[in-house]
Amino acid sequence: MTTTVAVVGATGRMGQLISQIVEASDEFELVASLDSKGELSDMLGADIAVDVTLPAVSQGVVEYAVAHGMNVLVGTSGWTGERITELERRITGNLAVGVVIIPNFSVGSVLATSFAQMAARFYDSIEIVEAHGASKIDSPSGTAVRTAELMSQARGSRGPVQAPHTDQRARGQQVASIPVHSLRMQGVVAKQDVVFGGNGEVLTISHDTLAPSAYEAGILLALRATRTARGVVVGLDRLIDMDGSRERATQTAPTGAASGPVDDGGPSGQAATVTSA
């Protein structure tokens, strides 16, 4: 049985990509395509809604869907920790709906953010440089915001990072005390560098999205999770086996137990590097 999908923001790049993936899948059926200014009532009747609109529009789309008992997959930037906490309060007690918020559908990007979160405990000088195509309106990106927030959480008692001269505009926007610098230019799909400065060394965790195909696996994974989600789920990392515990559980299962498919291929359309100088 297929799951019907309504895409809000279907005319944008991500909306077009998600629509193509849905139409090509045997698991899902596209039943409504709305632009960011479309009538939200047009998505009613679908099993799940996908919001890939604009930061100023996204919250209204999600609230409308939740109010009508629809699960929502959110791929729009601008969902800060404060907005997510507010959303969690709104749907507390409503066990019938779920909202899955994915700042970045790229598996490589999620891994790079996880590596940065690990490194944040060991360095006090940290900055983020992110780049996207010239058509991306908002800045900093949702990925950069989530990376900064997760690194800040990981630092715990170490407190805020060292960020001198942040009163100067060229020093970037501070997110969770971490300076973030945003580039918007032609020829770029998506790129993020997290730079850590230490005593006599610099560590850079870098991820480049080279083609939209980098998002396909993550989009399908998120769509599947949205079907049965309850409450608020944030990040692709919540949906994949980040620490290998699920795989180990499968390997130790009794003989004859069913195991999931194994993909030995690396993610397409992306490149990740960790460098230390």
Curated annotation (Swiss-Prot):
Residues 245-277 are annotated as: Disordered. Its EC number is 1.17.1.8. It is found in: Cytoplasm. Its main location: cytoplasm. Keywords: Amino-acid biosynthesis, Cytoplasm, Diaminopimelate biosynthesis, Lysine biosynthesis, NAD, NADP, Oxidoreductase. It holds the Pfam family DapB_C. It catalyses: (S)-2,3,4,5-tetrahydrodipicolinate + NAD(+) + H2O = (2S,4S)-4-hydroxy-2,3,4,5-tetrahydrodipicolinate + NADH + H(+); (S)-2,3,4,5-tetrahydrodipicolinate + NADP(+) + H2O = (2S,4S)-4-hydroxy-2,3,4,5-tetrahydrodipicolinate + NADPH + H(+). GO terms for cellular component: cytosol. NADP(+) binds at residue 37. NCBIfam families: dapB. This is 4-hydroxy-tetrahydrodipicolinate reductase. It comes from Clavibacter sepedonicus. The gene is dapB.
